[in-house]
Amino acid sequence: MVLIPMGRPEPTTIKNKMTKKKIKINTRAKREIDRYPLVAVYWLDICSDASWQSIESSKKSKLPTCVTKGHLLSQKGGITRIFGDYSLADEESGKIDEIGNTTIIPNSVIVEIKKIS
């Protein structure tokens, strides 16, 4: 019989630049859409593999970095919210009626956020 020690696994450290990375929302913009900057969010995703592989090969596996682009809605409560589409209630004033194609990303998996000009 082989005994496997129980307890906490070895910690895996992933550097996360998100701790102090926030992008401000321009609440004073005349057109509502201009309040929400266009951004690219780089984040780490979960990866699974059902194939047979060696332990060493599995230990060398890396998390994939994904990129989501859209308008930054908010960064509160450990969550970054993005939307890709919107409909205008009034085109002249730029008032937004509804948003769509929304993505909610936990800040703990975000590596970087870049503002798109």
Task: Give the role of each language-model region.
Residues 1-10:
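Short, positively charged low-complexity motifs
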Residues 13-117:
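Conserved RNA-binding domains used in RNP assembly and mRNA/RNA metabolism
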